[in-house]
Every structure is written in structure tokens, then in C-alpha cells.
Regions:
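Conserved, well-structured core segments that form the ligand-binding/active-site neighborhood
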Residues: 72, 202, 206, 313
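Transmembrane alpha-helix interface/packing and boundary motifs in multi-pass membrane proteins
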Residues: 61-74, 183-189, 247-254, 285-295, ...
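Hydrophobic/aromatic residues within the transmembrane alpha-helices of Major Facilitator Superfamily
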Residues: 23-30, 60-63, 67, 144, ...
Length: 396
């Protein structure tokens, strides 16, 4: 049955390889089930419900990608867009998280429309390459800034705007240590370096008495506080247009880049150089963002960490289905998710930000007409603390 659905032999893989690849991808992505609920809670959402929503939305998206597109790609709420959701749309602009979810829903609908028409191709080709790269890099700096701030590594200063944090505080030291642990594990190519770093710092906090341990496993919290709570009518406002398109653009280009990278690694390219079933993969991704809002999630997107599973031998959608099953079983670890503090996730945010900045090497530095607006986007997204404003300034 699995052979018929996923064509394992045709793709030169096996059940054993797909299981290993699926688990590898999940381990590299698992940090999101701890980081995302914490981020969403800042916007006013119930953290327990957000944890369950993150797990279920990721599970549904991965399983859908596996069966519909037969691609070895894991999906979950995206880093960067969740920060934009919380700190800009809700925090700075003052919209409720329900209206913000409505904006995510509308952006997802537009993404679906683009995925089933030629609008996607036109959009990808009409925006200069440097600007597409710059969006991801700017979001990376945005995420990194949030990580540095939440970990106490940088603090506000009236004279210099920012200054170094107080390393005499144990929380600040643990934030820096978390980043160091993740970096060392990543350099040594340890699978799941990010989630391991978060857990090590969390258990260190428990040992020294900073965190109260409430167990590892329990029945999952209710998803009712976030389920079907998006305010679509509230998002149908002229002032929300830039926000909706910010969600759309960042998700579109992030997804396109991730899928192209995974396709090359997984040999999902035919003899003519065309990517196999790229349209189905894009439809699965865009639909997942819409589905995620039903549960109460910021935009769901394809994860570049899927490359780790491909390197482990994943070649078909069975890998994605395994990732989805792992996310589904994660809902029973809510006690652990609820005690993970900001200083444990700060290092993860900073490390993910650095990964997102790696795209700068692809910039065309010889064409000043594209380079200047690209650099404006990269710099202004974190400095204005807004993805929408940064992108707008670069395009203008």
C-alpha cells in the first residue's frame, strides 16, 4: 500500500529510510512547538491552546504535503512571521490577535489563488532577485533582535538606544550559553541541535531552581480558546492591506526558496530540468496557511530544516507523513512546553536568525540598482521593528 501511494522503489528509497528521514526532520523542527506558543502568548493568546494548535496545524500540514504532493517536506508555523504577528501587528499596531489571524487567513487565501493560477509565476519573476533574498534576511535580523532582547543580551539605553545586557544575571548568562550550546552541536552536525540546546538550558534552570518542574506528559490542553477565533471581517480594512501583503510576500518567497532547495537535494528534478510536482507542493503549502488559522496559528510554511531529512535519505511524502505523526504525538508534552522560559528559547531565536542571514551570500553585489533597495529592506525591517515597513521602504 505504501509503495503504491508513495512510489518508494521508483524514488530509490525504502520504508526504513523514510522513517529515519522523517524522524530526523522532526527533531530539527521540533523547537517550534516550544518557541511558537511562547511567542503567541505574548500577543494575548492562551499558551496551552497555542501549543496544541501549533502541533495540530503542523501535523495536518505535513500529512497533507505527504499525501497530496509526495514531497519530503515538513511544515509548521514559520519563524519570523510569528514574530511579525506578535510584536508588530498586535504589539505595535494594536490589533487584536483575532484580527491578526484574520489577516493571516486572507493572506493564505491569496497565496492559494496564486498557487493555482499564473499569478505565482508572475509575482516570482516580477520582483528582482535581490529583493526576494533581502526579505528573508531582513526577517532573520528581526528574529535575531527579538532573541537578543528576550534573552537580556541587549537592553534599552536612553543615551545609546541599546547597550549590552547585565551578564551578572543568571538568566542572561543562560541565554548566551544556550546559543553557544546550539552552535557547538550544529558545528558537530548533531541532529536536533536547536531543540537539544533549548532542553539543556531548561533542565539547567530546573536544577538551579529558576524553573518549577511540573512533569513531562499530560492530557493536552483545550484548543477552544484559539479554535476558529480569527476575525476576518475585522481584517477587511484598508489599513490591513500592507500587513496582509507582508504575510503573503514573505511566505511566498520563503516557501519558493525552501521548495527549490529541497527539490535539488532530493533529486525531484526531471531530465528537462523541471521540478516534479512543484505546483502541488505550493498548493499544499498555501492551503496549510489557511488551515492553520482555523486552529489559531500564524502562517504555516515549509521548513528549510527538511533538507536534514533529505540528507538522511528521505525522497517521498512518506517522510512528511512521519513528521506529521511526530507532531501529533507531541501534544501530550504540554507540561514541558509550559515551563520553557524565554532565556531557554533566546539562543534558538538567535541561531535561526543567523541561518536566515546566510542568504546574503546570494545577493548580486555588482548591481547597485538592486543592491541598495535590498540592503534598505534588510536594515530597516529590524530597525523599524516591522516587516511591512521594511519591505515598503525598500520597494519605494
Amino acid at each position: 500500500m505504501l509503495e503504491k501511494i508513495f512510489e518508494l522503489k521508483l524514488n530509490n528509497t525504502s520504508l526504513k529510510k523514510e522513517l529515519l528521514a522523517g524522524f530526523t526532520t522532526f527533531v530539527t523542527m521540533a523547537y517550534i512547538i516550544f518557541v511558537n506558543p511562547q511567542m503567541m502568548a505574548i500577543s494575548g493568546m492562551d499558551q496551552g491552546a497555542s501549543f496544541v494548535a501549533t502541533c495540530i496545524a503542523a501535523a495536518v500540514a505535513c500529512i497533507f504535503m505527504g499525501f497530496y504532493a509526495n514531497w519530503p517536506v515538513g511544515l509548521a508555523p514559520g519563524m519570523g512571521l510569528n514574530a511579525f504577528f506578535t510584536f508588530t501587528v498586535v504589539g505595535e499596531l494594536g490589533y487584536s490577535w483575532e484580527i491578526a489571524l484574520g489577516a493571516v487567513f486572507l493572506a493564505g487565501i491569496l497565496f492559494v489563488i496564486m498557487s493555482i493560477t499564473n499569478l505565482r509565476k508572475w509575482m516570482l519573476e516580477s520582483i528582482p532577485f535581490n529583493l526576494r533574498i533581502a526579505m528573508g534576511c531582513g526577517v532573520g535580523l528581526f528574529v535575531g533582535f527579538i532573541g537578543l532582547k528576550s534573552g537580556g543580551l541587549i537592553v534599552a539605553n536612553e543615551a545609546t538606544f541599546l547597550s549590552l545586557g547585565n551578564f551578572a544575571q543568571i538568566e542572561t548568562l543562560l541565554s548566551a550559553l544556550g546559543f553557544l550550546i546550539i552552535s557547538v552541536l550544529a558545528v558537530r552536525k548533531v541532529p536536533g541541535a536547536i531543540i537539544l540546546g533549548v532542553l539543556i538550558i531548561t533542565f539547567t534552570g530546573i536544577i538551579i531552581g529558576l524553573i518549577e518542574f511540573n512533569g513531562l506528559v499530560s492530557a493536552p490542553p483545550s484548543i477552544a480558546p484559539t479554535f476558529l477565533k480569527m476575525d476576518i471581517l475585522g481584517a477587511l480594512d484598508v489599513a490591513m492591506i500592507s500587513i496582509i501583503f507582508s504575510f503573503l510576500f514573505v511566505n511566498l518567497f520563503d516557501t519558493a526558496g525552501t521548495l527549490l532547495g529541497v527539490a535539488n537535494r532530493a533529486n525531484l528534478v526531471n531530465k528537462n530540468g523541471e521540478i516534479i510536482d512543484i505546483d502541488r507542493a505550493l498548493k499544499a503549502d498555501s492551503s496549510s496557511s489557511v488551515i492553520g488559522t482555523f486552529f489559531g496559528c500564524s502562517p504555516v510554511t515549509s521548513y528549510v530544516e527538511s533538507s536534514a531529512g533529505v540528507e538522511a535519505g528521505g525522497r517521498t511524502g512518506l517522510t512528511a507523513v512521519i513528521v506529521g505523526i511526530c507532531f501529533l504525538f507531541s501534544i501530550f508534552f504540554s507540561p514541558l512546553a509550559s515551563i520553557i522560559p524565554a532565556f531557554a528559547t533566546a539562543g534558538a531565536l538567535i541561531y535561526v536568525a543567523i541561518l536566515m542571514l546566510s542568504g546574503m551570500e546570494k545577493l548580486n553585489w555588482s548591481d547597485i540598482t538592486e543592491l541598495l533597495p535590498a540592503l534598505i529592506i534588510i536594515v530597516m525591517i529590524p530597525l523599524t521593528f516591522s516587516i511591512a515597513n521594511g519591505i515598503a521602504l525598500g520597494f519605494i
